[in-house]
Design a protein with these regions (language model features):
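Phosphate-handling DNA/RNA-contact segment within nucleic-acid enzymes
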Residues: 1-75
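TOPRIM fold recognition
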Residues: 48-147
Length: 147
């Protein structure tokens, strides 16, 4: 959404950015892992966890080549873990395929995996980080690898 400061309008294309990368870049380099969230809130929630914050947000529900290039150039993660919000019930196959296809599309660049809640640990539209560190780690340990 554009913002006006004095007589000048500024706009920021969200698809050309990764929220939080400026703060988490060194952690991603150190661990080789990047958690890819939809919203900025999830990146901020990770700050309260007893683990390194390796999260960035795409500020939406899509991940594109431009954002991947930013990640690879700035910190070259060995694995990108897609941690998108849980989507509508009844469309589980569609949601699973969406996450899988994002990872598959870019799997030549690094390892991809994604969090897929099979056990109902998070509610509809929740981020994997919304229920706290313990649930996040449980989901993380059961993530789906993209081959």
């Amino acid at each position: 959404m554009p913002i006006q400061i004095e007589q000048t309008w500024y706009k920021h294309p969200l698809s050309m950015n990764l929220y939080g990368l400026n703060f988490t870049k060194e952690n991603i380099k150190e661990t080789g892992i990047c958690y890819l969230f939809e919203s900025e809130k999830s990146v901020l929630q990770m700050e309260g966890f007893d683990m390194l914050n390796c999260g960035v947000a795409v500020c939406g529900s899509n991940f594109n080549k431009y954002q991947l290039n930013i990640l690879m150039r700035e910190c070259a993660p060995k694995e990108i873990i897609i941690c998108f919000d849980k989507e509508e019930q009844g469309n589980e196959d569609k949601y699973f395929n969406k996450l899988y296809n994002i990872g598959k599309k870019y799997s030549n660049y690094c390892k991809f995996s994604f969090i897929y809640d099979r056990e109902g640990l998070i509610s509809l539209k929740d981020s994997p980080a919304d229920k706290g560190e313990e649930i996040f780690k449980t989901l993380l340990n059961k993530r789906v690898e993209v081959h």
